[in-house]
């Protein structure tokens, strides 16, 4: 039984987690992930772990051919903070009056929404789906 615990730390932690998971998984020829029962952690580490897990699923479904490719690490390390920094400096003045609908529910667009949009763009929408 394998339990993976990731640490927080923003985009560096996301990249580190992604790199470590790729290395362990490639070295063990996928056996480590087959025996993984729990992936837990915080912040950037969980983003990296979620992205890697999504890549594994995409490979199993035949959507991608090789989850170990370098460009996946490059994707997760792309800038996600410029848009957020702009929103923080403008104090969400213009953004808070915008909303979006998801599955019949209306949500206010905020920094979290902007972060999610940038993450989806950076990772080619691989994480852009409902969990239910």
Regions found by a protein language model. Give the residues of each.
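Catalytic domains of lipid- and phosphate-ester/thioester hydrolases
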Residues: 1-132
């Amino acid at each position: 039984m394998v339990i993976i615990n990731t640490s927080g730390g923003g985009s560096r932690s996301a990249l580190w987690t992604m790199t470590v998971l790729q290395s362990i998984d490639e070295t063990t020829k996928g056996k480590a992930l087959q025996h993984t029962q729990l992936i837990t952690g915080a912040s950037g580490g969980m983003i990296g772990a979620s992205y890697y897990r999504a890549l594994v699923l995409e490979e199993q479904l035949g959507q991608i051919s090789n989850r170990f490719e370098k460009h996946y690490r490059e994707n997760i390390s792309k800038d996600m903070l410029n848009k957020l920094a702009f929103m923080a400096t403008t104090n969400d003045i213009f953004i808070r009056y915008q909303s979006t609908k998801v599955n019949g529910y209306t949500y206010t667009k905020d920094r979290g929404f902007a972060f999610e949009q940038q993450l989806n763009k950076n990772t080619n929408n691989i994480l852009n789906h409902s969990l239910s």
